[in-house]
Amino acid sequence: MSSTKKPLVLTILDGYGHREEQQDNAILNAKTPVMDRLWQQQPHTLIAASGLDVGLPDGQMGNSEVGHVNLGAGRIVYQDLTRLDKEIKDGDFFTNPTLTAAVDKAVKAGKAVHIMGLLSAGGVHSHEDHILAMVELAAKRGATAIYLHAFLDGRDTPPRSAEPSLKRFTEKFAALGKGRIASIIGRYYAMDRDNRWDRVQLAYDLLTQAKGEFTADNAVVGLQAAYARNENDEFVKPTVIQAAGEPDAAMNDGDALIFMNFRADRARQITRTFVNADFDGFKRDKVVNFGDFIMLTEYAADIKVACAYPPASLENTFGEWLMKHDKTQLRISETEKYAHVTFFYNGGVEEPFKGEDRILINSPKVATYDLQPEMSSAELTEKLVGAIASGKYDVIICNYPNGDMVGHTGDYDAAVKAVETLDNCIEQVVAAVQAVDGQLLITADHGNAEQMRDPATGQAHTAHTSLPVPLIYVGNKEVKAVEGGKLSDIAPTMLSLMEMEIPQEMTGKPLFIVE
């Protein structure tokens, strides 16, 4: 057997959806001679990346975490959002032992119950329906001091869409006759994932000390003041919500804190700030010794606090199956999507499999990626091309974040530039794969950059879409594309192209049939 391997490369263009209409479509309007040529000349198909096809509620847009879990699992994986919706509908949520024990302990000790999370109907990191259920659970179990610390979205939802959510919760607390919204802050600060500790510190001080740059009598007034300062939801500066005569809602020893985000990647940093004894991201002026800190789902295996909904383990994901067959694999991306091609792709497993190498390219340190739409794609491509040529790997899995990260800024011109940058990168990847007689699949995890304006509101469209994504084959086999596929069909497709057995746990089907 030759020691030089001919790799199968999976290139995931994050946020690169397929939409026929040209209006506000940064992908269709960009100059993409390489992708155009591949689409015309190579076997290709469109695959579903949203809703029930990826284990989300019907019609729910896809996202990167969900996309990569399905890509790696080779079966539809029912997501936390769907699981939690069902728990609430069936009533089981209200008897969850972890949540009820934390609330009961705080009530018994006369302490407050703090609930924090992304107050959004976006369904990507959280859902406000779950937060509402948590408020109801706390109230039903006798909590009177119930404080909601609302992180505002504007990224997976329109840029200025928080007001109805804040009104809904203000009315809910009024109806209960207990509890209130205690603070609002944009997710840019509270949910950073790129070690920008100066941002996280502003959120931490707001939550622990009720200390913010701004104060308002109620949440809607606080939000409107932020809009007047030209801050969209995502960027709302720390605002304490406290009417005259109300006690402050700072977090104190013995209080319960329940973090209602279900997606891990943007929940980890702020969680570590609260719970790590050796935390050194910044100097914490106040360290709170909570009665309980509960994470809704497991944000990381090394965060040692209680978890209301631990992960269900996935057997025989693509990466694990490769390991069992002594195959070598490489995962490579920038900071922004590194967790996706490793942790999420491996079904929530943090440790690399035997034979799995990883390369992390630092994303550029800019405030928002419209300022540098090419991101770190040149360095990423250089490393990827080198890995393809090395002969070391049977499989290489790469994610280019540009379409998604620049799409999220809502800046159309920057998104076009991002897409044109990707086209140049793909040209180099195709050449590298062909030079070693390897195989290449090009796809996406969900859409974004193909819809840069919301036709209903006229606002910039910063969220993902529920549109299909492309799947293109470039390689040395004569193959025929199958229609009607979805993300969970990609792992079986790859195994089939490698002429490997498909494990029974993978219920997806190959989308390229060798002729």
Swiss-Prot record:
Binds 2 manganese ions per subunit. Pathway: Carbohydrate degradation; glycolysis; pyruvate from D-glyceraldehyde 3-phosphate: step 3/5. Its EC number is 5.4.2.12. GO terms for cellular component: cytosol. Keywords: Glycolysis, Isomerase, Manganese, Metal-binding. Substrate binds at H125, R155, D156, R187, R193, R263, A264, D265, R266, K337. Mn(2+) 2 binds at D14, S64, D445, H446. Pfam families: iPGM_N (PF06415), Metalloenzyme (PF01676). It comes from the Bacteria. Mn(2+) 1 binds at D404, H408, H464. GO terms for biological process: glucose catabolic process; glycolytic process. The keyword Metal-binding applies. Its cofactor is Mn(2+). The active site is at S64. GO terms for molecular function: manganese ion binding; phosphoglycerate mutase activity. It catalyses: (2R)-2-phosphoglycerate = (2R)-3-phosphoglycerate. It is an enzyme of class 5 (isomerase). Belongs to the BPG-independent phosphoglycerate mutase family. PANTHER family: 2,3-BISPHOSPHOGLYCERATE-INDEPENDENT PHOSPHOGLYCERATE MUTASE. Monomer. Catalyzes the interconversion of 2-phosphoglycerate and 3-phosphoglycerate. This is 2,3-bisphosphoglycerate-independent phosphoglycerate mutase.
